[in-house]
């Protein structure tokens, strides 16, 4: 036992040696990490007994030994130990490692925030030039004015006219339950406070107790979602971030922008109606491949958001009434207050209010005016609530706020009056914050985008033309479709009546348009058409909006995803802009969405990244030619394989001219928690997007040299060929993929409301991009990210050795190329082909082993060539912090990888025999009852007891360790 303790102590010492000298100053990561793990292991011993804790440490030690030498024998030893646990013990051990990875993530977040604060205190805004940190708004403004010699006024004008629209989507990549996310938040808070400078010994003791309590509560919560979420659940989960961080985070961030402006000599605040940050959502609006998003769901989600918005305003209005107790006001406000006072009943009492429930006297004019706002907010909230619960409401719509201008008007009146009476300082307090919230969130909190596949609209049009007996729309050429759609758009007659024969699918599409027509227009953002290829796709939606009587039609946004669609997108847009009717309809503004996930799945990361770059350049040229302002909407996932990566780098590496002060970008799944899970994270996210968008517009990145483009074009052809020859043309690839990864078991995690496939049968092309990336992330082989890079580098360097120098020059001088390479390098730092080899040996049929070996040799070759291009001796040598943090995690992730491989073996091969020892964990230390009660949480599993839960826990743990799922 003593020997074991020494071993554990020696691991801590090794971890300390891992830290390069440069890193160790004021670096508390290891301290935080060790504290959380100590507390957790104590809790584990208290709950499940000393034997179990020792087993967890033994497993960790074996894994750490493997990490030191990468000896495959150690993985086998680890496998033998893991398979000897009985069902209950397996679940507890897998859960322990998953839990420890979540704790490591929390320690890291607190440490990053701590280090950033320390630097800011010293007035150091610069950050290490690595991928995990970014510049803040103050530094960006100073850089533009002092280094780039821009005038402060020019910077201010650009800033107040730019817009970043963050679109929250329910992509099924958030694998941690909300119950756990909340507990994690409390652990984070305890940690932050424990390291505060002015903490007393008593505080420390109480915080330590709270920390242990939260760690235990998280460990005792079932990590596995037992039922899949509905779209309404996803919406509520997304909206909880507004409640917890975004609502208060926006005005706080805008105050920081005001301060930063003051420091470059601008003595004005950002106008409250400047659209710096906007929020949209796909939750309950994205019906692409998700049959569970029905018109009723869309209606519910909109009403729910309106109710939540009214509730948030309502909860703040009384504070504002308390604050504005002044009697001095301008004539305009006095007249309004007198009028309201006259019209209110003499002894009106409002017993449902806590404060200001009696009639407000006239010598408090601001309170009189705000009292009327409060009454209207109350009715607005109640109306949405009744409509949501009962489908009807007796409160008339005109007694509520129906548009934002109506809501802003009395608030602006108060603001003007305060300024006129010399009370600008008071006006710029809570009232300004409130005005900014109203301008940002409106009455609907977020604007809901609707997304639908273009084929579904084509089916509706086909039904209409057949019903009118003028032929089959589906069989018409693009020219004929456009001609007919335009003649209908210009004409006035209704296209169809109630006698149109409708399938369920057609009814669903038409009812969606009817819901859009029925609800207030400020509920909605864009109508996005996925798999859009031609102008008729856009015109069809315009016509359907008119037919269903949508008073303020939504802007229609084509989404281009596959490689071929991206190549033909500029031509399709030019054809659309050549239509006079359409140019008149859009008022000089168009939005185009580009998809990162499916383009990556279709051609591999290298070619997709380059094609996305070129498509944006060409789309902007088309828009400029027709005098249209184009907004690019980036559909990025969280993982590198789906376009993810650090925000500011992703923005700064976009082609010049393509952002131009307006940007829309999706924030998906687990990225929502990483961006908005905590107040400081929310602040940092808003800051990153705003600063990077401003910098990209005012200091555009350099355009690539013609010879760089030529080389990229050559390499993209090679990379696509290599990627497709394996993924689509290798006859047994799909079989290998399904055996070597947990793709077939992914659906059991219940993390999203939509199916994993667009169609139930079929190969890779029907699989959604998320499970495709998820499966490779789980085995730490990351094939979709790197496949193609190696072949491209090898062939161009073999052709001419000078190309290696050119690639190095591109890496050093061209932000887009550097970001692309750095992100793949980071993925290599997280990868381990040894784990993929173990999966092959256990799960893949022998005749496919050579194929697996061939892929692993490609992996090693790609890694070697990538390092040559970046002129690095080893992976991540330019980023010691990130390297250290990844190495702290490796042993935990490896344990879960081995657990997963052996559990899959037992699930898939009923003849696989293991020697199981007697149970060692107790249900709790006080009883001698074994922990196998955990097995009863999943009574309907079709596998041997405990296997399915163990598998899901390993998937969740690995996702936490890799810090992404799909």
Curated annotation (Swiss-Prot):
Its main location: cytoplasm. Belongs to the PEPCase type 1 family. The gene is PEPC. The modification Phosphoserine is found at residue 10. By light-reversible phosphorylation. Homotetramer. PANTHER family: PHOSPHOENOLPYRUVATE CARBOXYLASE. GO terms for cellular component: apoplast; chloroplast; cytosol. InterPro entries: PEP_COase, PEP_COase_bac/pln-type, PEP_COase_Lys_AS, PEPCASE_His_AS, Pyrv/PenolPyrv_kinase-like_dom. It is found in: Cytoplasm. It comes from the Eukaryota. The active site is at residues 171, 601. HAMAP family: PEPcase_type1. Keywords: Allosteric enzyme, Carbon dioxide fixation, Cytoplasm, Lyase, Magnesium, Phosphoprotein, Photosynthesis. GO terms for molecular function: phosphoenolpyruvate carboxylase activity. This is Phosphoenolpyruvate carboxylase. NCBIfam families: PRK00009.1. GO terms for biological process: carbon fixation; leaf development; photosynthesis; tricarboxylic acid cycle. Its cofactor is Mg(2+). Through the carboxylation of phosphoenolpyruvate (PEP) it forms oxaloacetate, a four-carbon dicarboxylic acid source for the tricarboxylic acid cycle. Its EC number is 4.1.1.31. Gene3D superfamilies: Phosphoenolpyruvate/pyruvate domain (1.20.1440.90). It comes from Medicago sativa. It catalyses: oxaloacetate + phosphate = phosphoenolpyruvate + hydrogencarbonate.
